[in-house]
């Protein structure tokens, strides 16, 4: 019998040198159509982070005849993505040297939806000629830096339909026929972050995927030396420029970002004093055990969505240790080892170069200008029985305070303020259905128009909503929800006459 290796070699050098997906896509025309500003778009996405990028990929794949047996060959969607950043970036401020992903590379932007896609992480490695080298790492967890590069690689394929440096400022309902009672499109206004120029684009369907905004405790004043963890790698080095200087730096928080920053500071500024302040009594390990990890399975969204409000809240609380205020065990052990070595040298913790203050909170910050250190007033928090958890009060003088206290995910509320009157009577919140489509009054909005929310639906769709885990499968659901009729061959109405309305 002929060896399998020999069979693969015969007449098929491309099998080992170039995947079929690359052969198919290398010379293919763009499947998403760049559209002039004054034309009506089929889809406009506000934000071009991982969620919108996954939608672009899913839509591209849905139009690929090699992957989809029944695409409407006569239809090419008019789409646009507006992104405030000047280029694609994913948590650029937290690309800490040595940091790894916390999920398997198989949960990339395409594999779980269709592993034949040319946008898989494995195909990225192949295109970069690193597949065998990555395999030799024997890991499912790539470096965070590499995974961001993978997403940049994907994003480059859609550069023709993305307008970077455009900050969306409002969404306004519109009517093709002014005498009609039904809204049938939305005008999306954006501001160029460099020139301030205002642009307007119209779209039948709008996806709002803004991501999170930095959450800062109200006790903290406005001061450039107080910065969110999302700016750690980009802003702090520009402010504290001398890596040999003996700075005093504090970190606030008890989750993965806080731990990574605290650990990295000790290498980035080896002569500096660092202090980690946390309300919790200790760093707690994240639970990524197999059964618990099933909470991030795509089908669990259906189960979570079907629960009552009270049941959803209980579920979120029960699974909190998978994502909130927790740290990977490997990093906890590294930090504990560092603390132990200090204890060997000096049992007095107050004299340590690097300290952890558990059970504490910052109550007040004194700041007197850029040339004097800030003074942090720290005291012990109280538990449910009104008992002190930490050890009383303490004052710290610091050159910088890194705040790793998470993100708010409510930016869509201000953006959609002009659409509020279209919600069903008596509904005060932005309520998405299972397909992430916002519930709007059908007596006011045409079924052809709609708004979808991404990354802000944890209360209705579960813990995975703002994470990468289900992006691949969810993006397929989104494309089906938004464009299902077009893929089935439904006639798409001619909208070129709307151009004159802008």
UniProtKB/Swiss-Prot annotation:
Catalytic reaction equation(s): L-ornithine + NADPH + O2 = N(5)-hydroxy-L-ornithine + NADP(+) + H2O; L-ornithine + NADH + O2 = N(5)-hydroxy-L-ornithine + NAD(+) + H2O
Region Disordered: start-end pairs: 1-34
Binding-site residues for substrate, renumbered to this chain: 107, 293-296, 323, 469
Enzyme Commission number(s): 1.14.13.196
Annotated binding of FAD, by residue: 83-91, 102, 168, 466-468
Factors inducing expression: Induced under iron-limiting conditions.
Biological process per Gene Ontology, one example term: siderophore biosynthetic process
Single annotated GO MF: N,N-dimethylaniline monooxygenase activity
Taxonomic superkingdom: Eukaryota
Keyword annotations of the record: FAD, Flavoprotein, Monooxygenase, NADP, Oxidoreductase
Cofactor names: FAD
Coiled-coil features, chain-numbered ranges: none
Top EC group: oxidoreductase
Pathway membership: Siderophore biosynthesis
Cofactor binding remark: Binds 1 FAD per subunit.
Binding site for NADP(+): 254-257, 279, 323-325
Biased composition range(s): Polar residues: 13-26
Regions of compositional bias (Basic and acidic residues) in chain numbering: 1-10
Family annotation (PANTHER family): L-ORNITHINE N(5)-MONOOXYGENASE, MONOOXYGENASE
Family note: Belongs to the lysine N(6)-hydroxylase/L-ornithine N(5)-oxygenase family.
Function noted in UniProt: Catalyzes the conversion of L-ornithine to N(5)-hydroxyornithine, the first step in the biosynthesis of all hydroxamate-containing siderophores, such as deferriferrichrysin.
Quaternary structure, from the entry: Homotetramer.
Protein name from the UniProt record: L-ornithine N(5)-monooxygenase
Organism: Aspergillus oryzae (strain ATCC 42149 / RIB 40)
Classification lineage: Eukaryota, Fungi, Dikarya, Ascomycota, Pezizomycotina
Gene name per UniProt: dffA
